[in-house]
Amino acid sequence: TVCEVLKEQNCLHQGETPYQIQLRTFEAMKRDMFPYLTDPDVFEVPVGSIEFVEAYLRKMYGIEKMVPLLVPIQLDIPEYLGRKDALVSSKSELREKASEWGAEEIFLKSASQLKCDYTGVYDIRKDTLPSDKEMYISEVLNIFSEWRVFVFNERIVGVKHYLGDPWVMPDKSVVYQMVREYTDCPAAYTLDVAVAADLYSGKSSTVVIEVHPFVS
């Protein structure tokens, strides 16, 4: 199995980095287990962690890395956001934007990599703010429940509860409207939505959190 191959490679090459082991493992799998991968007419879908998928795409197709989709421009409107958001490139710019919003806390994540170790809510008055060249920030929402919507060829194929109260469900018509309006999209993606208190009206509404490549 793939797990057995990975364990064997980890054991045989303990002095190498995980990335080097991944590349060596792919070569072994390609040669011994999946010789048909050399056939250009065959397309395989890697299943695993983001790190695994990125290493696979890099090795097999020369794709260096996947870029976060964040909130696509077609969905980045007040009707769907329920909050303010922005892209910033420094701590000073981050603080300026938060001050403009009148916010003492902001949600922050990387705008250049799918997974990072600093995603979270930060108090802008403290010195613990991370520093990065490309960061996505937004006002902090009061979220009651969060859901992941699976979309393939612009059609919803599944919905999964993600966080919060599973009995607080998103507005079906709003979710379908988001999918219809997000036309500049990949063939397959996931749409994270939440039921949250609107920061301005206080009313509960269905909002977009972010969009991910389908590997998420």
Predicted features by range, described:
Residues 150-151, 156-157, 186-216:
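Conserved metal-phosphate-binding beta-hairpin within the catalytic cores
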